Amino acid sequence: MAKRDYYEVLGVGKNASDDEIKKAYRKLAMKHHPDRNPDNKEAEEKFKEVKEAYEMLSDPEKKAAYDQYGHAGVDPNMAGGFGGGGFGGGGFAEAFGDIFGDIFGQAAGGGRRGGGPQAYRGADLRYSMEISLEQAAHGHEAQIRVPHWDDCEHCHGNGAEPGSSVETCPTCNGVGQVRVSQGFFTMQQTCPKCHGSGKFIPKPCTKCHGQGKLKSQKTLEVKIPAGIDEGMRIRSSGNGEPGINGGPPGDLYVEVHIKQHPVFERDGDDLHCQMPISFATAALGGDIEVPTLGGRASFPVPEGTQAGKTFRLRGKGIKGVRSGYPGDLYVHVNVETPVKLTEAQKDILRQFDRSVHEGGSRHSPQEQSWLDKVKSFFS
C-alpha cells in the first residue's frame, strides 16, 4: 500500500512551522498511543505512522529531502534506493554524483573526489526510552544498553584469518569503483567484488566473517534534561554504527516518550488536572489543596463556584527545556454530586432545595435563565 503524505498524516500544511508540526504530532501521538489504546492494532499502526511522519518533518535535512523528492528522497527502498535521507547512505545527490562524476570530474553534492575507496559515515542508531512525567519535569539520569562494535580479537580488526593477508581487489585495482559504459555515458559504480573497500580477503576471518568487527553491547549513561517533551531526541555523537572504509561512525539518537500520568495531562510546559470538590465547598467557598510536581499547593475557591470552572496556578507547570521558564497548572474543578445519602441527609437537601427555589433566580440564576428560554420556546 502506498505511503500517505507525511503532512497529510499530521494534518498540517506544507508551509507549517516547526511548532505547528510538533503540536500536531503531540496531539495525535497522545490520541493513538498504545497505552491509551490497549489491544487496538489500528491505533498502534496510526501511532507508528504519526511517529514516522514526525521523525521526517522534524529533521531539517530529512524534511528538505522529502519536500524535494517525496518519499523517494527519504526511503532507501524506493526510487532505486537513494540512501536514507541523512541516515546511512549518501542520499539522492550522492547517487547521481556516482553517475555523473566521470563527466564533471567530481561527485555531485560532496561525493567522492579522485581515486581510492570511498569512505562512508556509519548509520545512525535510534533508541526509544519511556520515562515518567516527574522524570521529564525534573531531569533524569539512566543507563541504557546499546549495540557496539569492537575490533575482532581473532584477526585484530583486518578481517583476514590469521596467517593470511588482505590483498588489493583485482577487479578495481584498489580504487573501490569500476567504470561501466552505457551508450554515450561512462558511469562509475561501486565495485561489486569488494563493495567499495578496494580490498579482497581470500580467507575471511572465521570469527567476524571478514568484517573486522564483532557486535556486542555496551552501557551508556544518558542525561535527560529537565523539561524535555514528548518525542524529543538526545544525540550521542559517535555511538552509532561504525563507518565504512575508515569513515566516521554514526550517532545515537535517544528518543524520549513520556508515560501517561494518572493526575496530570501535559500541554507544552503547562499542566492540566481535574479536581473534584464537594457541593458544599462549591457553594460556600474555601481553600482547597492540589498536588503539583513540586509538592502541594493550595488556592481559594470563591463561593458560588460552578462546575467546569478553571483556576490557573502560575509557575506550577514544567520549566521549559529551551525557555527555562515554568509553565502554569490549570485546575479544572468538578462539583461532585453526593451519593448514597441517608434519609436524614435527603430530608435536609429537600428542605434546602425548597428554600433555594423560594429565593428564585437570586440563588440559581442559570436554572432560571434556562427555564425562561424554555418558556419562550413553547409560547
UniProtKB/Swiss-Prot annotation:
GO terms for cellular component: cytoplasm. It comes from the Bacteria. InterPro entries: DnaJ, DnaJ_C, DnaJ_domain, DnaJ_domain_CS, HSP40/DnaJ_pept-bd, HSP_DnaJ_Cys-rich_dom, HSP_DnaJ_Cys-rich_dom_sf, J_dom_sf. The keyword Zinc-finger applies. Zn(2+) 1 binds at C152, C155, C205, C208. It is found in: Cytoplasm. A zinc finger (CR-type) spans 139-217. Keywords: Chaperone, Cytoplasm, DNA replication, Metal-binding, Repeat, Stress response, Zinc, Zinc-finger. Its cofactor is Zn(2+). Its main location: cytoplasm. Binds 2 Zn(2+) ions per monomer. Residues 5-70 form the J domain. One of its GO terms (biological process) is protein refolding. CXXCXGXG motif repeats lie at residues 152-159, 169-176, 191-198, 205-212. The keyword Methyltransferase does not apply. Participates actively in the response to hyperosmotic and heat shock by preventing the aggregation of stress-denatured proteins and by disaggregating proteins, also in an autonomous, DnaK-independent fashion. Unfolded proteins bind initially to DnaJ; upon interaction with the DnaJ-bound protein, DnaK hydrolyzes its bound ATP, resulting in the formation of a stable complex. GrpE releases ADP from DnaK; ATP binding to DnaK triggers the release of the substrate protein, thus completing the reaction cycle. The J domain is necessary and sufficient to stimulate DnaK ATPase activity. Zinc center 1 plays an important role in the autonomous, DnaK-independent chaperone activity of DnaJ. Zinc center 2 is essential for interaction with DnaK and for DnaJ activity. This is Chaperone protein DnaJ. It comes from Cupriavidus metallidurans (strain ATCC 43123 / DSM 2839 / NBRC 102507 / CH34). The gene is dnaJ.
